[in-house]
Amino acid sequence: MTDRTLTDEMTIETHGCREALALAGTICDLYEAVFSLPPFNGNAAEFANQRSYFPKLAERPGFRLTTARSGPEFIGFGYGYPLPADTHWWSRLAEPVDEEFAAETGTRTFAVIDYGVLSDRRGAGVGHRIHDELLSGSGAERATLSVQPKAVRTREIYRRWGWRKVSHKLMDPPIPAPLFDILVLEEMPGAR
């Protein structure tokens, strides 16, 4: 676990599989609190799906969970894993990417699967700190994530942090939005 105290009361920590599994209930509650609000408007099926797949994700090689706490209260999170060589991440894109771009080694690209900060804690840099900590220790050359096109504010934040859209992808239920933008960050935090 990496521990970075940001203020007297705020702490950023990165966890591996075992710690992530112990925090699963807390992370799933945070996910629901973040993604039940506009513009995401998550539903019960999405939240049940996230609770079901989080433990499976935590067991993937290279999985990382980064959390933010203010005192004892968890206020934000981000998690993901390196894309395996046989990934389907780059398939079913509306605008296909070339073979070289889509080639994965198991360490080339870190996929940010879910990421969020409680609404009353946004705008204070918490999200950026989670983002940088999660990615800087991943060992990957680049990162990718998906974001709903209607999440205009979120997309703008990612753009300011250096992410760019490479395509969009149709998602399967119970994901609430059928279409997601696929973004890539090619200059990882710590390399800037």
Locate predicted features.
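Conserved N-terminal entry element of GNAT/NAT acetyltransferase domains
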Residues: 1-25, 29, 33
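Short glycine/proline-centered loop/turn elements that form peptide/ligand docking sites
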Residues: 127, 131, 150-154, 170-177
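Conserved catalytic-core motifs of GNAT/GCN5-like acyltransferases
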Residues: 144-146, 164-179
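Active-site rim helix/loop that mediates acceptor-substrate recognition in acyltransferases
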Residues: 41-65, 69-71, 75, 79-82
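Conserved acyl-donor/pantetheine-binding loop and adjacent beta-alpha core of acyl/acetyltransferases
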Residues: 79-116, 173-176
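Conserved acetyl-CoA-binding loop-helix of GNAT-fold acetyltransferases
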Residues: 114-119, 123-136, 156-160
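Conserved GNAT acetyl-CoA-binding A-motif
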Residues: 136-150
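Helix-loop element at the rim of GNAT/NAT acetyltransferase active sites that forms part
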Residues: 28-44
